[in-house]
Amino acid sequence: MLSTKRKALDTGLQRRVRARRESSEEIEESSSDSAPSEIGRDDNEEEESSSDETEDEVEEEASESEEETSNDAAASISFGALAKAQATMSKPSKRDSKKSKKSNADGWEDNEATERKAGKKDQRDFTRSSKNAPTEISSKKAVSRRREVVPVKKREIRDPRFDPTHGPVDMGKIEKVYDFLVDYREDEIKKLRKTIKKTKDEDEKEKLKRDLLSMESRKKTDAKKRKAREILDKHRKEEKELVKEGKTPYYLKKAEQKKRVLLDTYGELKGRQLDRVIERRRKKVEGKEKKNMPRARRVVE
C-alpha cells in the first residue's frame, strides 16, 4: 500500500512541476509581447483549474490503489479467522450483561406481576433500619404451579419383622432372640474401661469417657424396661388365673405400673441407701417443676 501511495504522489508532483514551468514560460512571453492584463488573468485561472484537476486525479488514483490493496488483504484472510471475528462481535460484553442484570433487579421492584411468578425469589432489600426495628418480609410469596391432581401415597420402607400386619410386637420374644447383644455390650464396656486407663491423651480420654457413660446409661434404661416388662407379665399371669376362677380382669394403668416398678427396685433398700435414692428423686422432681414454671416464679424469695 505504501509503495502505491508513493508512486501516486511522485506522479502528482511531476505534473505540478510541469504546470508551473508552462506558466512561467507563458508569463515571460506575455511580458516580452506586452500583452494586456486581462489575458494574464485568464491564463492564471486556467493554470489553477489545471492544478486542481491534477490533484483530484492523484487522489482518485490513491483511493483506487487503497481499495485494491484492501481487497487483496481480505481475500488472503482464512475462513477460520473470519468465523472467530464474527463470534467475538456477536458475543455481548461483561459490562452489558451486568447492566442488563441491574436493570432486571430494578424492574423487579417496580413490577409486582413478575414477583408473583413461580420459582422466583424476592430480591428486594429488607434490611432493618436498626437492630430494634422489626424485620420486613414480603407478603407476595410465589405459589408453585404444580398441583396434585391424583394424590399418590408415599412409599414407605419398612422392616418385615416388625410389620403391623404380623400383629403386635412381642418384646419378650425379641429380647430372647437378640439376647447375645447384651453380652457384646458388656464386653465393649470392659474394653473401654481398659483403654481409658491406658490412654495418656486427655482429649481422647474425655471422648472415651463420654462413650462409656452413654453405654452405661443405655444399659440402665434397658434394665429398667426389662424389669417393668417382667412386673407386667407377672400381673397378667395372675389375672389370667383369676379369670379362670370367674373373676373380672384388672388392667394396670401406667401410673400404677410405675409405682410397682419403684416398689420392686427400692423396696429392698434400707438405711442410707434408701435416703440417697429418695433425695435424688426429690431433686429430679424439683428440677422438672422449675422448668415448667414461668420465669417470674422460678426465683424463690
Curated annotation (Swiss-Prot):
Acidic residues bias: start-end ranges: 43-70
GO terms classed as biological process: maturation of SSU-rRNA from tricistronic rRNA transcript (SSU-rRNA, 5.8S rRNA, LSU-rRNA)
Superkingdom to which the source organism belongs: Eukaryota
Region of interest called Disordered, as start-end residue ranges on this chain: 1-169, 199-232, 282-301
Coiled-coil region list: 182-272
Predominant location category: nucleus
Basic and acidic residues compositional bias, start-end: 113-128, 145-164, 199-220, 286-301
Subcellular location: Nucleus, Nucleolus
InterPro entries linked: RRP36
GO-annotated cellular components: 90S preribosome; nucleolus
A matching Pfam family: RRP36
Keywords: Coiled coil, Nucleus, Ribonucleoprotein, Ribosome biogenesis, rRNA processing
Disulfide bonds: none
Assembly behavior: Associates with 90S and pre-40S pre-ribosomal particles.
Free-text function comment from the UniProt entry: Component of the 90S pre-ribosome involved in the maturation of rRNAs. Required for early cleavages of the pre-RNAs in the 40S ribosomal subunit maturation pathway.
Similarity comment text for this entry: Belongs to the RRP36 family.
Descriptive protein name: rRNA biogenesis protein rrp36
Organism expressing this protein natively: Sclerotinia sclerotiorum (strain ATCC 18683 / 1980 / Ss-1)
